[in-house]
Amino acid sequence: MVKPRLVFLSIAGPKDEQLYLEIIDPKEKHLLARYQYLGELSLDVINDLVNDGERTSNDCFLGLLGVEEDISTYAFYSNTKVKFILAVKAPDYVVKETEIRQLLRRIYTIHTHAVCNPFSMDLTPETLKTSIYFKESLHQLISDWNIH
């Protein structure tokens, strides 16, 4: 049985602008267009979920958005309307949503610390790409999760 592994992380701003996209496995960089497409599809699902008038839950974790072949996408929607999309490849393994929920909350915390840095005056989409704290913390979190 092949254990699950993270495929990509996408972070989108309040207006669905892409703030960050990280393809976890460097060998899959050639699949950038596919992962961008999955991220865009996920944004449509997120917007449908959060704009649903019947939605009663205030939980930021939106859960499983969809499955494309062997890649499952999950989402977290912050109170500032920042969207976190995480894709997991799990061909023969059931991924526990509680694990994904915890992982997305930790990513959200890392993101918050990076963009709320009082010493950084530059809060643009480049903030995450240039933040050493964000990159190192995220890479450590991802490597820990992939080997658990």
Swiss-Prot record:
GO biological process: endoplasmic reticulum to Golgi vesicle-mediated transport
SUPFAM superfamilies with a match to the protein in the record: SNARE-like
InterPro entries in the cross-refs: Longin-like_dom_sf (IPR011012), Sedlin (IPR006722)
Membrane-spanning residues: none
Gene Ontology CC terms, in alphabetical order: cytoplasm; cytosol; nucleus; TRAPP complex; TRAPPI protein complex; TRAPPII protein complex
Alphabetical list of PANTHER family matching this protein: TRAFFICKING PROTEIN PARTICLE COMPLEX SUBUNIT 2
Protein's recorded name: Uncharacterized protein C15A10.12c
Species this protein is from: Schizosaccharomyces pombe (strain 972 / ATCC 24843)
Lineage of source species: Eukaryota, Fungi, Dikarya, Ascomycota, Taphrinomycotina
